Amino acid sequence: MAIERTFSIIKPDAVAKNHIGAIYNRFETAGLKIIASKMVHLSQEQAEGFYAEHSERPFFGALVAFMTSGPIMVQTLEGENAVLAHREILGATNPAEAAEGTIRADFAESIDENAAHGSDSVASAEREIAYFFSTEELCPRTR
């Protein structure tokens, strides 16, 4: 199996409800290691840049407004098949369709405020990690 890195966001709704620790526990229980983490309050420019691929979609303005509404936690996770493993832990984008026991089923209220984001591919993960973290901020776990 391949050791990969993936990018994750705990969104403003889950941060506001103090779910950070519970969500981190889910990552670690699944064998994903947190190798970088920080709290950020995105500016409009940062949010628009991060979600630029959605700029022509009808939900873009609401997404940017939501993602700038409060602090978020951004983290880089490392582990075997990390991209897929993380997405499985998150559950379906729409919490109404998310499997029982997933982060979105347990912590999200709606498709718009769905608790967390996860990279959808290794290429996306690399781009998203670099958007928030310098190489020096990544701390591979050696123990």
From Swiss-Prot:
Protein name: Nucleoside diphosphate kinase
Keyword Transcription regulation in annotation: no
Binding site for ATP: 11, 59, 87, 93, 104, 114
Location of the active site: 117
GO molecular function terms listed in the Swiss-Prot or TrEMBL record: ATP binding; metal ion binding; nucleoside diphosphate kinase activity
Keywords: ATP-binding, Cytoplasm, Kinase, Magnesium, Metal-binding, Nucleotide metabolism, Nucleotide-binding, Phosphoprotein, Transferase
Protein family per UniProt: Belongs to the NDK family.
SUPFAM superfamilies on file: Nucleoside diphosphate kinase, NDK
GO BP of this protein: CTP biosynthetic process; GTP biosynthetic process; UTP biosynthetic process
Record gene name: ndk
Gene Ontology cellular component terms for the protein in this record: cytoplasm
InterPro entries: NDK-like_dom, NDK-like_dom_sf, Nucleoside_diP_kinase, Nucleoside_diP_kinase_AS
Compartment(s) of residence: Cytoplasm
Enzymatic reactions: a 2'-deoxyribonucleoside 5'-diphosphate + ATP = a 2'-deoxyribonucleoside 5'-triphosphate + ADP; a ribonucleoside 5'-diphosphate + ATP = a ribonucleoside 5'-triphosphate + ADP
Record EC number: 2.7.4.6
SMART domains hit by this protein: NDK
CDD domains reported for this sequence: NDPk_I (cd04413)
Protein species of origin: Shewanella halifaxensis (strain HAW-EB4)
Essential cofactor(s): Mg(2+)
Enzyme class: transferase
Function per UniProt: Major role in the synthesis of nucleoside triphosphates other than ATP. The ATP gamma phosphate is transferred to the NDP beta phosphate via a ping-pong mechanism, using a phosphorylated active-site intermediate.
